[in-house]
């Protein structure tokens, strides 16, 4: 598999499947050890959404009259919620200024910024949504992850942002990095994101290759 130039993570997934099959056959002694992968030191620049790029996506959505999409981008990026948690952003939650998110038997409270609440309430009134979910389709059903993904991708060309950077989860990554720059508290960020492990949160904070190169340059050790 290495000769086929597969990524180490991909190889480990395949090995795990083979190992499960070997156990099923009653041959556990023939299991293969997975590759040891060093934790990444930096993220791929081609997938890192920057703040200016996010703002261009927002502006493009507004220019095209796609108010719902613009608000969706702001809601995900401004609170750090998962795309699957958008359904918890209800009229009632906006009036309270917080959303109660239930996931895996746990309830997490997400504070909704005042400015965002005012925008959401204005949109809800305009759409005549008196209660329940705010982000609805024309059939008054909750908007799906697939639709959000597709609508975001449709902004890429006009916004001048690479499609590889434009997907809902990247908004959550941008929130995490921006939040950490302000508070410098990874434990607090983990709570906000709903992570049970700080190690998961650390993945969100990995710098890009460009940022890492800048750090090395600032060391001043190359004369």
Report each predicted region and the residues it spans.
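N-terminal core-binding DNA-recognition domain of tyrosine site-specific recombinases/integrases
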Residues: 1-17, 65-67, 142-146, 165-167
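Flexible interdomain linker/hinge and immediately adjacent N-terminus
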Residues: 28-56, 101-105, 138-141
């Amino acid at each position: 598999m290495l000769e086929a130039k597969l990524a180490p993570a991909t190889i480990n997934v395949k090995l795990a499947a083979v190992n499960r099959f070997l156990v099923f056959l009653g041959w556990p002694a023939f299991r293969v050890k997975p590759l040891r992968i060093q934790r990444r030191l930096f993220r791929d620049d081609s997938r890192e959404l920057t703040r200016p790029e996010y703002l261009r996506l927002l502006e493009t959505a507004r220019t095209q009259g796609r108010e719902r999409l613009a608000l969706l981008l702001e809601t995900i990026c401004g609170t750090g919620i998962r795309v699957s948690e958008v359904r918890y952003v209800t009229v009632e939650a906006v009036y309270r200024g917080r959303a109660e998110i239930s996931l895996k038997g746990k309830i997490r409270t997400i504070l909704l910024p005042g400015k965002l609440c005012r925008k959401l309430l204005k949109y809800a009134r305009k759409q005549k949504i008196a209660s329940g979910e705010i982000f609805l389709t024309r059939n008054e059903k909750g908007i799906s992850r697939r639709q959000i993904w597709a609508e975001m991708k449709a902004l890429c060309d006009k916004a001048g942002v690479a499609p590889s950077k434009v997907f809902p989860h990247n908004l959550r990554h941008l929130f995490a990095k921006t939040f950490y720059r302000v508070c410098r508290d990874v434990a607090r960020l983990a709570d906000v994101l709903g992570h049970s492990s700080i190690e998961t949160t650390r993945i969100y904070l990995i710098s890009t290759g460009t940022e890492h190169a800048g750090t090395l340059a600032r060391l001043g050790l190359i004369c």
